[in-house]
């Protein structure tokens, strides 16, 4: 069997959080979470998982890469930029457990991965991949020229028989305006094969619409397979020309839910670990729910390896 490959594009940042008088340090990023959880759930000879970003030449960046390699995520497409650093965010938790996030990322290395001397070579390599996965955040951190260049890469990948997967993860503060985001998402969906959506993000960006209208709009943009993630509710899978699937989530007692930080990222990973290996959408959605329901029972985006579902 030929080993297929997936390139997951995005940004991973240094995470600082306060515990009493101490600061805890970790690493976090939506697409990185997905990369790790796919890597943990596929057989190594079935799918190679590559992460695509830019980092600095600092020790934090080196630690990040080492931790990804331990997870089986390939780092050969990651660039190290001399004059840049990874972004950073701080999580402040108040007495009620409510969290506030503060970001320092405006000049992070990841913003420049398509502007570096190696960008042409990496773009050519990406065009040969079986799958490319990215999120709304992967788009948001790029300038207009880099976004246009990325779309060219995605179109080339599809022309070569590859598939593009997009998660609509929308963070308004990363965009200049809704108009800019709508245009970028429309361009993106026009070259997407599988789209992961949450209705919260859809409503925030496009205005509230019934689910069937959201599906109609997304299919109309050119997407063949649309997966709507609905947290503790059943997910919906709509494949062009097939009956709508509704797959129930795994119900957990309230006291078991510890941290929903990476629920959506891990659902996508579970889904893709089955779907990209030839599994049905029904089985993929079940795996997505199982992965997410496991992850939210632990603190932090990346749970211990031994806690992963069988």
UniProtKB/Swiss-Prot annotation:
Q: What is its EC number?
A: 2.7.1.45
Q: What induces or represses its expression, per the UniProt entry?
A: Expression is probably repressed by KdgR, which binds to its 5'-UTR.
Q: Where does ATP bind?
A: 169-171, 229-234, 262-265
Q: What is the protein name given in its UniProt record?
A: 2-dehydro-3-deoxygluconokinase
The protein's enzyme class: transferase
- Residues the entry annotates as binding substrate: 29-33, 89, 103-105, 171, 265
Q: Does the keyword Glycoprotein apply?
A: no
Q: Which Pfam families match?
A: PfkB (PF00294)
Q: Which positions, given as ranges, span the membrane? A: none
């Amino acid at each position: 069997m030929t080993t297929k490959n997936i390139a997951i594009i995005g940004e991973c940042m240094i995470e600082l959080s306060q515990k009493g008088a101490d600061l805890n340090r970790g690493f976090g990023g939506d697409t990185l979470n997905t990369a790790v959880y796919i890597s943990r759930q596929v057989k190594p000879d079935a799918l190679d998982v590559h992460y695509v970003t830019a980092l600095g030449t600092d020790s934090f960046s080196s630690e990040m890469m080492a931790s990804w390699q331990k997870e089986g995520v390939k780092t050969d497409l990651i660039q190290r930029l001399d004059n840049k650093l990874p972004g950073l965010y701080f999580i402040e938790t108040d007495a009620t457990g409510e969290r506030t996030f503060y970001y320092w990322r405006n000049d992070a290395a990841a913003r420049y991965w398509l502007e570096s001397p190696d960008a042409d070579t990496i773009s050519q390599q990406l065009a040969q991949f079986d799958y490319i996965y990215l999120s709304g955040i992967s788009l948001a951190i790029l300038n207009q020229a880099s976004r246009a260049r990325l779309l060219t890469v995605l179109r080339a990948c599809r022309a070569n028989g590859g598939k593009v997967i997009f998660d609509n993860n929308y963070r308004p503060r990363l965009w200049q305006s809704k108009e800019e985001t709508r245009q970028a998402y429309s361009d993106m969906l026009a070259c997407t094969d599988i789209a992961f959506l949450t209705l919260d993000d859809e409503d925030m960006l496009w205005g509230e619409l019934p689910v069937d209208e959201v599906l109609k709009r997304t299919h109309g943009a050119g997407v063949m397979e649309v997966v709507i993630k609905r947290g503790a509710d059943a997910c919906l899978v709509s494949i062009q020309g097939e009956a709508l699937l509704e797959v129930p989530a795994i119900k957990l007692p309230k006291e078991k839910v510890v941290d929903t930080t990476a629920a959506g990222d891990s659902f996508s990973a579970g889904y893709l670990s089955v779907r990209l290996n030839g599994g049905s959408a029904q089985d993929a959605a079940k795996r997505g729910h199982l992965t997410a329901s496991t992850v939210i029972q632990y603190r932090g985006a990346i749970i211990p390896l031994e806690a992963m579902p069988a």
